[in-house]
Regions:
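DNA-dependent DNA polymerase catalytic subunits
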Residues: 1-4, 11-292
């Protein structure tokens, strides 16, 4: 049996005069250093443990534990592919519109590393959503129907499935089937999230209007903020806020000097707050509703 685990290392190669090395040269040096690190570390590990070089990422976004995306190189600095784990592009319970905007941002950053181009793409995409230019099929979410729920009235697609069964008893959704739905405008406040969704066919037949903004607050905002929070200092629109942000970070570092985990957590919250204000607040979005 061979058990494996990963150890990520960061290298910042410099010239003798202290100038940071970038591009393909930095990538080549990093690969060689990583190979050497593995060989040296193995000498100090108890057999049969062995630390071997596997891959190098450039660029690389580490969102959280087991959630990352980057361009993967092995030994050839001219040959790479995109590699990701645990990001929204892998989730089945997100609407296609989420994958379109998130995937578009990732593509731009991974291919050209042009943060400003990614920001422009994001703003235009959000505008298209708010202007209701996104087709209905891009808003469809699907979730599997289970046999039992402890609180069925709080499970949106279960509420919808029951409603569909009452409308057409002969075609009531069965356990295990995937229920497609779209968030709709209700014209009044509703308590249950299940009352804010409908089947795509029913929407078309009855001329109902999709609630586009909920897709921003409930599915798009969080993952997109996590990306830009990591490159906040590189955003041109952040320039005027930078000094105030740095003061806040120093304050948090002093407050949580004995708790690194809490310090990182609160700094990331501060980063996300700035991204939200810079990219999302101007959209006049509703308060996010709880997801099920």
């Amino acid at each position: 049996v061979k058990n494996t685990d990963s150890c990520f290392m960061t290298f910042s190669p410099e010239e003798l005069d202290g100038t940071r090395i970038k591009g393909k040269k930095a990538l080549d040096i990093t690969i060689q250093l990583a190979i050497e690190c593995g060989e040296v570390a193995t000498k100090y590990l108890k057999a049969p443990h062995d630390l071997e070089y596997e891959k190098t990422f450039d660029p690389f976004f580490l969102l959280s534990k087991k959630r990352y995306v980057g361009m993967l190189y092995e030994h050839d600095i001219n040959k790479c592919k995109r590699k990701s784990m645990g990001i929204v592009l892998k989730r089945r319970d997100n609407a296609p519109v989420v994958k379109d905007i998130y995937g578009g941002i990732i593509d731009i950053i991974m291919k050209s590393q042009d943060i400003e181009a990614a920001v422009l793409f994001t703003k235009q995409f959000l505008k298209d959503i708010i202007d209701e230019k996104i087709p209905l099929d891009k808003l469809i979410i699907t979730k599997s129907l289970r046999e039992f729920y402890k609180c069925p009235e709080s499970i949106a697609h279960k509420v919808l499935a029951d409603r569909m069964g009452k409308r057409d008893p002969g075609n009531k959704p069965s356990t295990g089937s995937r229920i497609p739905f779209v968030y709709i405008k209700t014209g009044k406040k509703v308590k249950l999230q299940g009352d804010k969704i409908e089947h795509p066919d029913y929407i078309k037949e009855n001329g109902l209007k999709p609630d586009y903004k909920i897709y921003i607050t409930n599915q798009i905002m969080k993952p997109v903020m996590q990306i830009y929070a990591l490159v906040l200092e590189q955003l041109k629109i952040f320039k005027k806020r930078k000094k105030g942000f740095e003061r806040k970070v120093r304050s948090l570092e002093r407050k949580w000097k004995d708790d690194d985990k809490k310090c990182v957590e609160y700094i990331m919250k501060e980063r996300n707050k700035h991204v939200k204000e810079l990219l999302f607040n101007e959209a006049e979005l509703p308060v996010p509703i709880e997801r099920t």
